[in-house]
Every structure is written in C-alpha cells, then in structure tokens.
C-alpha cells in the first residue's frame, strides 16, 4: 500500500479546464495529517506510518490514546489511520511531522475510500433496482413487493444472499482511478474529478491508484 492522506469531503462544484470544458469536481481538504507513529519490521512486524487528522477536544480522548499522542507530540484528531509503506519511505518520515497535498500532483490517478450516505431501511426497488409490479390488470396489492423469494416444500427455505429489503448505505466503499483535476496548495485542497463516497464533512482516505494504467 502506498502513502496517502486522510481528508474531509467539503462538497462538489465545477471548474473550467484550459480547453474551456466544464467538469464536476469534489473538493477534499487534506491538510494537517500529523504523524503519530512510524511502525517498523523490528518493533511491529511490518512497516507503516500512522497519521491523525482533524481536531478533538482533550476531554473526548481516552487516557491510553492521550499518552500515545503526547509521546508523538501531536494534538488529538478525529480519526487515526495507517498506511503501509516500505522501509525507505518510512526512513524519510519522522514522528510529530506532517503530510500534505505535495504527496500528489495534478493529473494523477487516485483511489478514494469513504462511508456512503446511509439511506435507512429500503425496499427492493430502491435497494436493488427491482421492477415494480403492474399498476392494474388484476394486481391489487402487489405493486412494489419483491415477489417470490423461493420454492415451497423443496428446498423449503430461503437461500442465503437472497436480495430482499433491508438497510441501504452506510458502508465503506472505494472509488478507483479518479483524476486530480486541480490542487490548491495554499488551502490544502484536492479537486478530484467526479464524485466520491460519503456526505459533506465525511472523512475519506486518499491513496495513489492501485490499478492506474500507464500512459501510452
């Protein structure tokens, strides 16, 4: 896994390219990723960097975590995440330092992970795009029901994984191969072409794309 950043989804807007095209972009604030720990093969069995993002009141931090952050000399954040890196990259970082937008460049392909918007309890039409039943012609009470969910005596049960009504959204999802359209280094913003998971102010993880294709 490559070194990435934790950020906050600010919202969406549109920008104009040099060719005059208007493209939709998502604004992601990725400033002040503070390094809380650097893990190595010798001490932890693997190499990684641990970072925190955002701000949290001291009264809302547990004593073990407060001690961990105090040892690193950083302020408490809303979220802590790890990025697996190689030993050479880990040697360039130091506890108490910070990471910012200079990890990325305009035109680079990235993967963005976030928690999707929760929709609550949803029916099969909204959840799985089932077709509605007939409005008339003998259909009186089965307009938006899923229909048959299995056979009768044999096998006499509903198979696991059957698509039915249930909770929709509020799950972790990753959108791959998004393009960085613009970088505002002064305000520590990434403008990502297209949409990313989550609601406004939701936390996201931005990493270099794992499936990026080399330019011809």
Curated annotation (Swiss-Prot):
Belongs to the universal ribosomal protein uL3 family. GO terms for molecular function: rRNA binding; structural constituent of ribosome. This is Large ribosomal subunit protein uL3. Gene3D superfamilies: 3.30.160.810, Translation factors. Part of the 50S ribosomal subunit. Forms a cluster with proteins L14 and L19. One of the primary rRNA binding proteins, it binds directly near the 3'-end of the 23S rRNA, where it nucleates assembly of the 50S subunit. Pfam families: Ribosomal_L3 (PF00297). The keyword Ribosomal protein applies. SUPFAM superfamilies: Translation proteins. The modification N5-methylglutamine is found at residue 153. The lineage of its organism: Bacteria, Pseudomonadati, Pseudomonadota, Betaproteobacteria, Burkholderiales. The keyword Ribonucleoprotein applies. Methylated by PrmB. Keywords: Methylation, Ribonucleoprotein, Ribosomal protein, RNA-binding, rRNA-binding. GO terms for biological process: translation. GO terms for cellular component: cytosolic large ribosomal subunit. Residues 134-153 are annotated as: Disordered.
